[in-house]
């Protein structure tokens, strides 16, 4: 027969085994619950961190784009400044061109070809006398007026048909300078 103590030992062992199994299950469930919560928190904060990193990248890219635009504007401003300096230098050297024999012959050729009686010829203030002499030499009847906006050359107005032909140095210089701007920029800045 089994003694009470042995019986108690068996019951205690059996209950301990049941309790141990239950505690193992409870521990496993608790660990799973902790793991799930940890994974959930990790996913949440990982998403938040990714969002913050993405936002920071976008801000950096936006700032980079803004700075690129500012740099391009500054460079363009400098380029335009120096191109304008070249243009101003060209305008200052027009006196040499206007005193040349080729210029005078070209001006006379334009007047010979385009002038009609009754026309009005506009020219720079310093060329009025010269243009009047040319018109007299051509034996044409035309009025000569000075135009302070004209640097050189002439504009011929045909009043009878309402037409003005522009042979001024202003127009020629603007057209030539505009077409040569890329070459001038290449010379000044090493660009095409």
Swiss-Prot record:
Free-text function comment from the UniProt entry: Component of the A-type ATP synthase that produces ATP from ADP in the presence of a proton gradient across the membrane.
Ribosomal protein among keywords: no
Major location category of this protein: membrane
Sequence similarity: Belongs to the V-ATPase E subunit family.
Gene Ontology molecular function terms on file: ATP binding; proton-transporting ATP synthase activity, rotational mechanism; proton-transporting ATPase activity, rotational mechanism
Membrane association type: Peripheral membrane protein
Localization (cell): Cell membrane
Keyword vocabulary terms for this entry: ATP synthesis, Cell membrane, Hydrogen ion transport, Ion transport, Membrane, Transport
Assembly and binders: Has multiple subunits with at least A(3), B(3), C, D, E, F, H, I and proteolipid K(x).
Record protein name field: A-type ATP synthase subunit E
HAMAP family, sorted: ATP_synth_E_arch
GO terms for biological process, alphabetical: proton motive force-driven plasma membrane ATP synthesis
Highest taxon of source: Archaea
CC terms in the record's Gene Ontology section: plasma membrane; proton-transporting two-sector ATPase complex, catalytic domain
Organism placement in taxonomy: Archaea, Thermoproteota, Thermoprotei, Sulfolobales, Sulfolobaceae
